[in-house]
Amino acid sequence: MRQAGRYLKEYQVIRKKQKNFIDFCLNYKAASKVTLQPIKRFDLDAAIIFSDILIIPYGLGQKVNFKHNEGPILGSYNLKEFKKNNKQKFLSKVRNVYKAIQYTRKKLDKKKSLIGFAGSPWTLLVYILNKKSPKKNFNLNKIIQNKKEVDSLLKIIEKFIYIHIEQQIKSGADTIQLFDSWAGLLNKKNLNKYCYQPNKRIVKKIKQKYPNIPIICFPKGLHKNIVQFCNIVKPDCLSIDSKADVNLINKKISSKTIIQGGLDPKFLLGNKKACEKKALFYLRKFKHRPYIFNLGHGVDKNTKPTAVQHLVKVVRKFQS
């Protein structure tokens, strides 16, 4: 999950100087600086590069803006224009993401991992066609009604996700995470085509060329279908949201699969004892298998840094 953000004063100082969010992500020195802020504050075990999953639609030529209290707003998209993209053209538009990784790797403790990431095909498809967050008034049938166009678009998205991931690895990312943030919007009939198979193809392609790079998948909202996702996609690590069934995971998912996350970020906004209790719940539930403690989503903007610090202490104490 993104570690840097509005809950940190030092982040706000840098954010105010940036023209817009995409420019911020493409200012490699600023992106690197905010990537390292949570590491300096909390001494976390890994850093995740400060960027955004919508860098890919931006790199393909679609306008991407972020409106206050609304989230991302994307411009119109043209399949013919998307098809004109090649690797060189795409990389030239987003090259500063890779510069940020190189810059961060030099400054980051060698013992700490640097995580690169991308959105999964389905999630990027949703943003490209819906042109905004699908939280409200999302119509699945409308999005996928033009099967031929959707299939063509998915192929393009997949191709450039791989290009983007490979370039991050070449630049110094030693772990990759795929965010399928809107996997939960799919019904059972469409899961295989739009979620399982595209993620499987990307994971397989990365592992074939970079077998030592761990891959984390975050299929948010799958819940009952999370076992099938793991069986088909075969990620090294499964990242879970706060509604995931931990008993189902322990029972049905191989103990070789690392589990990450789970804690609802809202616990960081409330009582320390309640947060501590819930954190220990996950740590105890997954103590007999490889587990990376993390949140089930990004840090809320209203979180106090002291709450994060306390949570880190709770986890460290449990580990020892």
Which sequence ranges carry the predicted segments?
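Short capping/connector residues at structural and topological boundaries
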Residues: 12-16, 65, 69-71, 268, ...
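Glycine-rich, proline-tolerant flexible connector loops at the mouths of alpha/beta enzymes
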Residues: 46-68, 78, 83-90, 173-192, ...
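A charged helix-plus-loop insertion that forms the helical arch/lid used to bind
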Residues: 64-79, 134-140
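Active-site loop segments of alpha/beta catalytic cores
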Residues: 1-2, 7, 89, 93-320
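N-terminal basic, low-complexity leaders that serve as flexible interaction/assembly modules and, when applicable
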Residues: 1-59, 66, 201, 284, ...
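Short, basic, glycine/proline-bearing loop/turn elements
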Residues: 12-25, 79-90, 231
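Intrinsic-disorder/low-complexity, polar/charged segments
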Residues: 20, 27, 78-81, 135-136, ...
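A short acidic, glycine/proline-enriched capping/turn motif at secondary-structure boundaries
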Residues: 53-56, 71-72, 121-123
